[in-house]
Amino acid sequence: MVVKKTTQEPKSIKAQITRASLVVAAAAIMQEEGPSAVTYRSVAKRANTAASSTGYYFDSISDLLYEAGDYNMRSWARRAESVADEAEEMDVASCREHVVDLFLSACMPADTGTAAPHYMQLLAASESGAVTKAYRAGRIRLDAAIGRIIERVGLKDVTPRFVIALVDGAAVSAVSEGESAHRRARDLLAEWVYPVMRRDGLLAEEHGSGNGN
């Protein structure tokens, strides 16, 4: 699927603000209800603009969905990059001690109440080729940020995608069972990473017992 850039590029500051507000509105709707809920009318209502404005700035819903998906992905990448910055500012021992919290903060929304909607909308992304395209493209930055944490901790033979898959898998299973996504992901991260770090001499034997709590 090819998503072309809209031909209606805003020229004035006011127009740029209006267009940006439409992207933000679409991104919010997508996070709350999934791509299928993003329509010209729903986005205009959310952004408090004229219904015709959405069609003016975007050639199609696919164009809008792509930009909304890109907006969401960049937001998640910035969150992960901020956590990676924090990890690199720590001394190595502190970074290793807090590795579970760092991975969790980089991979999941901080607000525990948004975990279920977050993962439901990720699963719903398959409804739109434009959204999956945006998410695939944006994954590079997210992977790079997780990779920086892995490198700072000193973990060997671990990829960012493994960490993300572990967290996401734990979260989705918890959501499906009506349990805390953050708690399940935290427990599974601790169950995996602490034994690996002790095995590789990155952590004292006594540290990380009891799921890292």
What are these regions (language model features)?
Residues 21, 25-67:
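Helix-turn-helix
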Residues 131-136, 140, 151-213:
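Hydrophobic/aromatic-rich alpha-helical bundle segments in the mid-to-C-terminal region
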Residues 21, 25-33, 79-82, 86, ...:
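Solvent-exposed, amphipathic alpha-helical segments
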Residues 70-77:
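Short, basic, alpha-helical segments at the C-terminal edge of helix-turn-helix-like DNA-binding modules
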Residues 1-17, 201-213:
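N-terminal intrinsically disordered/low-complexity leader segments
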Residues 80-114, 163, 186:
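Hydrophobic alpha-helical connector segments
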Residues 81, 104, 122-123, 147-151:
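Amphipathic alpha-helical segments within well-ordered protein domains
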Residues 108-132, 139:
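Amphipathic alpha-helical segments used for helix-helix packing
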